[in-house]
Swiss-Prot record:
Pfam families: Fusion_gly_K. Glycoprotein that probably modulates membrane fusion events during secondary envelopment of cytoplasmic capsids that bud into specific trans-Golgi network (TGN)-derived membranes. Also plays a role, together with gB, in virus-induced cell-to-cell fusion (syncytia formation). Seems to block fusion of virions with infected cell membranes. This is Envelope glycoprotein K. GO terms for biological process: fusion of viral membrane with host outer nuclear membrane; symbiont-mediated induction of syncytium formation. The chain crosses the membrane at residues 122-140, 213-233, 244-264, 302-322. N-glycosylated. Keywords: Glycoprotein, Host cell membrane, Host endosome, Host Golgi apparatus, Host membrane, Membrane, Signal, Syncytium formation induced by viral infection, Transmembrane, Transmembrane helix, Viral primary envelope fusion with host outer nuclear membrane, Viral release from host cell. Interacts (via UL20 interaction region) with protein UL20 (via N-terminus); this interaction probably plays a role in the coordinate transport of protein UL20 and gK to the trans-Golgi network (TGN), and is required for the cell surface expression of gK. Belongs to the alphaherpesvirinae glycoprotein K family. It is a multi-pass membrane protein. The lineage of its organism: Viruses, Duplodnaviria, Heunggongvirae, Peploviricota, Herviviricetes. It is found in: Host cell membrane; Host endosome membrane; Host Golgi apparatus membrane. Residues 1-30 form the signal peptide.
Length: 338
């Protein structure tokens, strides 16, 4: 059973889960029926060498040319949805439309279901990244409990291992006899691990040279973590191609908000060192600032932190204003287009 004990890892798991749920909601419920597919069209009356134009369904235009048989010998997954709104060309009563209607009638040559593309690319990558990150959390927790961890205060006591607790409960309740073999084994493991951690912190290069298996385990853990985060962040950089005309602006903004938050959270978790234990050796810092210097130091830290918070607030507001100005026409078109 996996229990995410670290608040930092739990926040990342929650963000990835929320991001995946937003994508699933948009794919299943959020997309408008008229904005699910794109069509490669050519106006009626133009030459065959005229370049095809990709566009989404427009109720002011007439789309002709639904195929009577599946393209390329078979329907793609969910491709029939794209052709359901088209009108077969033979149903139109006139063969050559008037010139005034040439630009209102479009011959469809290909259709693509953009929700299918979204489902099989972004949603799948998010799901794979979610499972990989859970695998990283499991590996990290096992290493903190049984392996070499630096700094030493990040170690978790092996006595809290679930199998040890379950064995003690079963032996005391059902067997009416104390079972301590696993506890003694874990205590011996804890002593040996503390010695290994001291050797690692003293000379990590020599330690890993003589014990390459530990380096391989730590390397696999880091690779799984970076691959998981890379898949999540990579969903924002996937080329949308012609389907970009169907995806709403809020989906792009939501994607970048989640991706940037997840990336910054992971970067903060990597760079931030955990708090030192309460019973740490106080001899390492004999000179504690007191008096006027201590007061000045605390005041300076408070002032600098306040300035940093205000700068972040100004940066966020400026970013929102720049995005609004850049997408002003697009926002107006999506708000008032019928």
């Amino acid at each position: 059973m996996l229990a995410v004990r670290s608040l930092q890892h739990l926040s990342t798991v929650v963000l990835i889960t929320a991001y995946g749920l937003v994508l699933v909601w948009y794919t299943v419920f959020g997309a408008s029926p008229l904005h699910r597919c794109i069509y490669a069209v050519r106006p009626t009356g133009t030459n065959n060498d005229t370049a095809l134009v990709w566009m989404k369904m427009n109720q002011t235009l007439l789309f002709l040319g639904a195929p009577t048989h599946p393209p390329n010998g078979g329907w793609r997954n969910h491709a029939h949805i794209s052709y359901a709104n088209l009108i077969a060309g033979r149903v139109v009563p006139f063969q050559v439309p008037p010139d005034a209607m040439n630009r209102r009638i479009m011959n469809v040559h290909e259709a693509v279901n953009c929700l299918e593309t979204l489902w099989y690319t972004r949603v799948r990558l998010v799901v794979v990244g979610w499972f990989l990150y859970l695998a990283f959390v499991a590996l990290h927790q096992r290493r903190c409990m049984f392996g070499v961890v630096s700094p030493a205060h990040k170690m978790v006591a092996p006595a809290t291992y679930l199998l040890n607790y379950a064995g003690r409960i079963v032996s005391s309740v059902f067997l009416q006899y104390p079972y301590t073999k696993i506890t003694r084994l874990l205590c011996e493991l804890s002593v040996q691990r503390q010695n290994l951690v001291q050797l690692f912190e003293t000379d990590p290069v020599t330690f890993l040279y003589h014990r390459p298996a530990i380096g391989v385990i730590v390397g696999c853990e880091l690779i799984v973590r970076f691959v998981a985060v890379g898949l999540i962040v990579g969903t924002a950089f996937i080329s949308r191609g012609a389907c970009a005309i169907t995806y709403p602006l809020f989906l792009t903004i939501t994607t970048w908000c989640f991706v940037s938050t997840i990336g910054l959270t992971e970067l903060y978790c990597i760079l931030r060192r955990g708090p030192a234990p309460k019973n740490a050796d106080k001899a390492a810092a004999p000179g504690r600032s007191k008096g006027l210097s201590g007061v000045c130091g605390r005041c300076c830290s408070i002032i600098l932190s306040g300035i940093a918070v205000r700068l972040c607030y100004i940066a966020v507001v400026a970013g929102v204003v720049l995005v609004a100005l850049h997408y002003e026409q697009e926002i107006q078109r999506r708000l008032f287009d019928v």
